[in-house]
């Protein structure tokens, strides 16, 4: 029996959507939502946030002439409905997979994706830039819409952009998708009535006529205009929560139900005609339409494949623990013994493994929101108050606070403990989340010490050792990976000597200098080279600063060639720093650095990406063997 055709089957692009009668849009939304649930239950991906914006996405593409009209998504992990409606429906099953769809908007994928996104707070700046460019270009006429969440709109960048937009008074729309931290409650039917009035063409037209008339009145005109504007604003402020946005120069509408697609279409059609910057405040629900995700949107923010009937996900290998979970557990142990310890995170309690720590020591955890610049300066100041701050942050987000790293920590030599998660290749989140820059800038900072654990016990030992280290700021950086729990001892005495490294094997033909997370691939390369008859030294560089230069040069004096293996960009990692210190005595011995080339590193599983860039053990061994043979170094 042939399956009955659905409305979604008829929609490949927004032009097809606009041919659907308005009254059938709720059915379209239902089908889009079911398609997301059906697909992601099999492949995983960002889930709850996408279920929460189905009606909004359908309404936007129904009202606006995309891609001529610009839709700009903040962060972008909520764009699966957008991808479904813009020609990528059949590829959603490949999302976040190697050579598949990105989990975020991506310019190379579609003309409907204006910007590659992944970090928060950028959309309003981009929307304002689009509006300014439009108005400087003769003959251009298109709408610009930024869609931003309630967490992102509190970022400094978003507020800076709103301040500028209020000054420029460009025609643009900001849609506030409020799905977690409600700014204010809807006051009911009066608010709805007012919103209907202020979005009407009639109201806005005669308001402009009225104020123009007042300006022409001699003597009393300007004063009367100011008076009536204050009355209008005051009446609106009493009944609706938009005072802050009005003060920034935005016309405010809301809060509105973000799941009433027909009302949204009618509202957006009116807002589209309004002049100046407009903010439309929508209340939505993460996980909308799927009970488990509605009950626990944090758990279902990002999912692995799950059982559609009840949302059950594989609990994973219980014999392993994530590096980030080690952080939370170890900080709990340390704080129990030392009340001066504090943990700081920019809106990443779950991701940074701090959930249990937050429950156990709520007064010692400071979640500063999406405010990386503030978080670093805040941590630096805590050291001045004799507190021991552990700044827990993803590598990709620390780049947002480089100025504070320089000015507010390293130049003053303040002993902040930086715990840098997701360093190196992070896999499915793709180019905007890869942690490939941190070693380049950390090693260029005055006073900053850098430790790169190569296993879980190193991680534990460094967290404990850092507690009493107050001579300088220090950073430890570690991958998004799991380690065997049974190999870990959270209470052992620490023997961590700065400037040391481990010599795991000694040979005479070649030395592999492995940095942190690349140790496993370096071990595989060593085994392959030794099986081919080469004599190999394998060095595990766990301390980059301070670096044991004399001891390292001593080891290199016993080999004929050496290579560096670093899970960073070749030109922005540790190799330049290392070579400046060891090349003077080993110039003729250097072969190459294995790392990523200076290009965006796309999404996929870490193993797939490592292999694609020939950074796996087998590829390293093959490349090195070829070089050795060309240099007449034979096994």
Swiss-Prot record:
Sites where the protein binds thiamine diphosphate: 77, 118-120, 151-152, 179, 290, 372
Residues the entry annotates as binding Mg(2+): 150, 179
Database matches in InterPro entries: Dxylulose-5-P_synthase, THDP-binding, Transketo_C/PFOR_II, Transketolase-like_Pyr-bd, Transketolase_C, Transketolase_CS
Catalytic activity: D-glyceraldehyde 3-phosphate + pyruvate + H(+) = 1-deoxy-D-xylulose 5-phosphate + CO2
SUPFAM superfamilies: Thiamin diphosphate-binding fold (THDP-binding) (SSF52518), TK C-terminal domain-like (SSF52922)
Domain of life: Bacteria
Keywords annotated in UniProt: Isoprene biosynthesis, Magnesium, Metal-binding, Thiamine biosynthesis, Thiamine pyrophosphate, Transferase
GO annotation, cellular component aspect: cytosol
UniProt pathway: Metabolic intermediate biosynthesis; 1-deoxy-D-xylulose 5-phosphate biosynthesis; 1-deoxy-D-xylulose 5-phosphate from D-glyceraldehyde 3-phosphate and pyruvate: step 1/1
Pfam families: DXP_synthase_N, Transket_pyr, Transketolase_C
Molecular-function annotations in GO: 1-deoxy-D-xylulose-5-phosphate synthase activity; magnesium ion binding; thiamine pyrophosphate binding
UniProt xrefs under PANTHER family: 1-D-DEOXYXYLULOSE 5-PHOSPHATE SYNTHASE-RELATED, 1-DEOXY-D-XYLULOSE-5-PHOSPHATE SYNTHASE, CHLOROPLASTIC
Name the record gives this protein: 1-deoxy-D-xylulose-5-phosphate synthase
UniProt source species: Leptospira borgpetersenii serovar Hardjo-bovis (strain JB197)
Encoding gene per record: dxs
